[in-house]
Amino acid sequence: LLEAAHAGQRSGEHLTQVNEACTPIESEVIVARRQLEGEPLMDLRVAQDLPVLQAYDQALCDRVARALATTGQVQVPTMVLAHAEVQPLPAARQHDPQFRQVPADVRARWNGILATLPAAPSDLSMQKWKATLALVATLHRAGVPLMAGTDAPSPLVYPGHALHLELALLVEAGLSPAEALRAATLVPARYLGIADESGTIAIGKRADLVLLDADPLRDITNT
């Protein structure tokens, strides 16, 4: 993780290799992956999930996060992905009206994937969700810039709505509502090098304004 950041990788998505970097087994995990590709690699990554979670070291993670913050790399945790894995699948489909609003071809693809998953969240999925919250909190405390992202339309990650959920999950992980909003506005503008023309509301800048009937700075779900 740190080698990539020091080499110039400006962003990291889905917390890829962040959890691994917070363990003393990062090197052996990565070396094993380098020998594979395609489906065998994906199978290995799944098999490594539990050992990586069990080897998590908070003190090490704090040091890694502080070091990562000095590189300027931005992390896009896409918390909605891990959150989707801990939702009861039948209930998520039957009671969420958004599922019926998804285009038929996307819905068919989702159904094919969801049919292979257990009806209730696994213990491993619950552990991964708790780890996601801990990792995002650690990165935030260390000053690593965070951007809001969703990876929609992954299964049960609804385009549009997922961004609002991501903001709420960032707040759950410890960001203030204002910090979560900046993760979807100012931080991306800085990352793209266009903060002088967008990302904040100011004279001479471009912006799309949304008028709300409640203050998201008090409650992020007011977005």
Regions found by a protein language model. Give the residues of each.
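Divalent metal-coordination and catalytic microenvironments
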Residues: 12, 75, 151, 170, ...
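Solvent-exposed coil/turn segments that connect beta secondary-structure elements
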Residues: 10, 17, 80, 214-216
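Histidine-centered active-site/metal-ligand motif
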Residues: 1, 11-14, 140
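Acidic, glycine-enriched loop/beta-strand segments at the rims
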Residues: 158, 176-181, 189-223
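Functional cores that coordinate and move charged inorganic groups
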Residues: 1-9, 20
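Active-site neighborhoods of metal-dependent hydrolases
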Residues: 18, 22-173
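Glycine-enriched alpha-helix->loop->beta-strand junction motifs that scaffold or abut catalytic
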Residues: 7-12, 71-72
